[in-house]
Amino acid sequence: MLDPEKYFNYIKSLDVEFFTGVPDSLLKSFCGYVNDVETKNHVIASNEGSAVGIGIGYHLATKKIPLIYMQNSGLGNAINPLISLCDKEIYSIPMLLMVGWRGEPGKKDEPQHVKQGRVMLSMLEAMDLNYFIIKGDKNEDYETTKKALDYASKNSSPAVLVVCKDAFSKYSYNKVQNNNIRFAAKSREAALAQILKKIPKDAAVVSTTGMISREIFETREAFNDGHERDFLTVGGMGHAASIAYGLSKYIKKSKMVFCIDGDGSVIMHMGALSTSGILGKSNFKHILINNGCHDSVGGQETVAFNIDFESLSVAMGYNF
């Protein structure tokens, strides 16, 4: 396995000084270390496409190569700027992508990751993105990383490090840097239990990716409730509000639809709030549980505690 600290220092020795992306469970040890030590040159982005955009801006300002990290499920968000801006036929922007390989063939994973893992390398090939696989062999992987950086530099093009499961050893990072986060994480499950008790029994529930959907499933089990009214958005992070809005628009108007969302999900595709807020009818209800972090993939902080969601919601057309 790769030691996150030593690997980080090795990458720094190759003149990679800026890091941005969206946290991933397979990369959580590396991302956790970066988050602990890089207070100035590290940005947790709203989504993977935004991370690529930030990396482009960094390169334009410095001519250096940024590292962009993400889970492979986030490649969809990154495709547009990678193809329409970074590609050698457009602006030819070099960057090093670090992509966690969820759903890697032959390795057990959650159902929503299996197809993504199976088609990922084919996707990269179709996009003409040269990839290099990181398996957790420190001698081989250091050389592989240098090859990837050399490729990005010489070809002025993105190169992809595909990181296998368990490539990084565990790192005990400071994943809760704020007492508010610690409190919010502990209280989320209790809040969900109260929400499920209070909403109408026949209401439809659309829940966001990560811990919220997992805990709703577990709470329903504990209450001996059925799951037929719930749509657990296990993939497609950031799209729960849009799904709930679409459902509320065409379901019987007498039936309520509750979107139970998280801060990381809302931030990822915040523009969707303008649609659900302005066009949503009285049967659409949007509940945000803000714990200030990406809890299910390592606990790295979001900027959510610095957002005035009440004012934002009013501006987006929501009624209180």
Predicted regions and their residues:
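A short alpha/beta connector and helix-capping loop motif
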Residues: 83, 92-95, 269-290
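Short, catalytically relevant binding-site loops at active-site mouths
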Residues: 75, 212-213, 239, 264-267, ...
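DG-centered beta-turn motif at the end of beta-strands
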Residues: 70-73, 255-266, 271
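Phosphate-handling active-site elements
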Residues: 250-261, 281-283
